[in-house]
Amino acid sequence: MPSFDIVSKMNEVDLRNAVDNAVREVSTRFDFRGVEATIELKDLTVTLRSESDFQVRQLEDLFRNHCSKRNLSTSGVEIEDEPVHSGKFYTLTMTFKQGIDQPTAKEIVKYIKDTKAKVQTSIQGDKVRVTGKKRDDLQETIALLKKSNIELPLQYENFRD
């Protein structure tokens, strides 16, 4: 029986490259001259620090731009609403999610069942397994999920006939 897995993984190498490129651009931009502005990555958490709220928002926009250039989706990112002010710095933390959490997995399963597709779904840890009788049914399910408004970037792997 054909099957595939729905996962949500962040490519850490591309994330590191996006951070490095953003740091390089910050060092050459005129509006950040003489300003202490940093972008740091640690365990899928990106920390943006600068001297003003406006500059932190500029760093966020710049970083999102570099992520999009590397085909990294920022839709599944947990981000603070307001930058935290401590001392003379404003700090904004962006945490990238790895894997599909239980509520989102249930939402994916419910979405697939509501479309009345001829497939079976099961939640297996941080991924969702989809099985069907025909390969066409699985490809139809992938197309439906790409059109859905699920907030995580989804990848499809382990496609078996």
Swiss-Prot record:
Keyword list, A-Z: Nucleotide-binding
GO CC terms: cytosol
InterPro entries reported in the protein's UniProt record: DUF520, UPF0234-like_C, UPF0234_N, YajQ-like_sf
CDD domains linked: YajQ_like (cd11740)
Highest taxon above the source species: Bacteria
One Gene Ontology molecular-function label: nucleotide binding
Recorded family membership: Belongs to the YajQ family.
NCBIfam families per UniProt: PRK05412.1
Function: Nucleotide-binding protein.
Protein name: Nucleotide-binding protein lpg1167
Organism: Legionella pneumophila subsp. pneumophila (strain Philadelphia 1 / ATCC 33152 / DSM 7513)
